[in-house]
């Protein structure tokens, strides 16, 4: 059938604390296009089918555990909403997937562990804002901790993202990513923006991986006045490609290689403070351009 538990017509479906749903076929818990229906999981959903929980226009809540080995741990369509207070483990495609006007929130105390493709993902193709918000913890050993695609797509981190792999937060195709919390990057990119998207840091990025913030293919990255990038590895901020822009208004603390690296026709602007105790405060290469309106404190090898 369509699902183990299905709700429509202002109904409630609830998987209790002792309940276990093993979904090997289609859908574990399903709201069938009804904005007044509610699905609550307090037990365990083990998804090896298509959707662990599928919410179309309704509301979903997780206080238990959702384990996704297949396509979608939780999928939201058409102005649906979902809040996670429990644990979502994703070894498949999407831990939480939000589409066209939907909102997904990982609340304080909630955990999303992503060893697959996307911990929390937003896709929008229309004019309606679609958002994923993390107030809890995201642990990423897969591709993306949080990612967004499309002009009205947005991912926001107010909690903690621990990125051990490729991307802590990524925005593409005109979407946006905002960090007001903490991103610990041991992998490739703490935050990344490309193809007309933007990534904004108002919190703290601790980079001991490759790049704290990265812009490419016309993306924009900005470290705001209250933002801190602590770089002990390769790049605090990195921008390449025509139309790419890196702006620092806050503080970049560099004890690694580069505070800012600007290349391949990209533009960098510093209005804040670059504290360089490492190799380079700023490096500009391959027709890049750098403008300094702020302060570069160099006690390392090279200021610019």
Show which residues each predicted segment covers.
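Beta-strand-rich solenoid/repeat architectures in extracellular/passenger domains
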Residues: 1, 12-25, 42-49, 63-70, ...
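Glycine-rich beta-solenoid repeat tracts in large extracellular/virion proteins
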Residues: 2-8, 27-34, 50-57, 72-78, ...
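Short beta-strand/loop motifs in extracellular/secreted proteins, especially
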Residues: 11, 37
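Beta-strand repeat architectures
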Residues: 18-19, 33, 218-219
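Short aromatic-enriched loop/helix-cap "lid" or pocket-rim segments at secondary-structure transitions
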Residues: 290
